[in-house]
Amino acid sequence: MNSESAEILEVPLAGGNMAGAVVKVGDTVRRPVGPQTPTVHRLLAHLRAQGVDWVPRVHGIDSKGREILDYIEGEVAHGEPPYLRKLETLTTIARRLREWHDATATFERKTDDVWWWPGKEPAEVICHVDFAPYNHVYRDGVFVGAIDFDVCYPGPRLWDLAYTAYRYVPLVPHSEDDVPDGPVFDLSVVAERTEYSLPERLARLDTFLAAYAGEDAALLYPASALLGWAVPRLVAMADWSDAQESAAVRDNGRMYRAHSEWIAAGGLGPAQQIDVVDLRV
């Protein structure tokens, strides 16, 4: 095989549940585009200009109409690899999300921007919306990058924080809790239950929130606030799942709804009541 044929060899990659088929070509990734692609590309360029070097560079559109991004070498954290629940991983993820939020706070919003969803009030930052293990790349157990930016949109910091905490703390019932949350469609990417005790989960949540805030006391959110935001965040996931054709995905939606109700009922302690308002277009 010569260098030219090696360069055009397309290697299918796992994932692509939102964007469709994803392939690796050389040291790049090729992905289908959508109406939001130009806005997302502008966002990624802004992030890198702000020093967020763990998001891929954009290299334009190929001859097949697909976007061209850097390929980030490593493994995507599907399932429960040993490093996923380390405290070091938890704090790293919180700090990376803080970097993302701070950088996107200065992103220039334009009237012709297109997002997957108009957004949520208050539109403090551009939320990744799916900042979760299955969209994170690790190398030797260390976070090295994030992928999949198709569903980004403006929103509150806590909208993002709630879902990331749900996945990484995790904010899910104990394996022995009586919560009607099954079955789910893909246990390799859904940590639907945990063996952490309630005190352990709350301690991990406090660690996550402290790492996100750093030295900024104004961003040290109380656990009750994050838990409050987790309720509508999971309801949004459930609503999206309910609208899908796949019965398996709708099963997954039942899990999100059951977990939202469990958190709202105090499964992890007091949760503030949050009324979420969509941005108007």
Would you name each region that the model predicts?
Residues 233-281:
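ATP/Mg2+ or Mg2+-diphosphate-binding catalytic cores
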Residues 161-214, 231-243:
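Active-site activation/catalytic loop segments of kinase-like enzymes and analogous catalytic loops
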Residues 219-223:
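Eukaryotic Ser/Thr/Pro-rich intrinsically disordered, low-complexity regulatory regions
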Residues 116, 125, 132-175:
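Catalytic activation segment of kinase domains across protein kinase-like and atypical kinase folds
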Residues 1-18, 265-281:
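Actinobacteria-biased recognition of intrinsically disordered, low-complexity terminal regions
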Residues 9-128, 132, 138-142:
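ATP-binding pocket architecture of kinase catalytic cores
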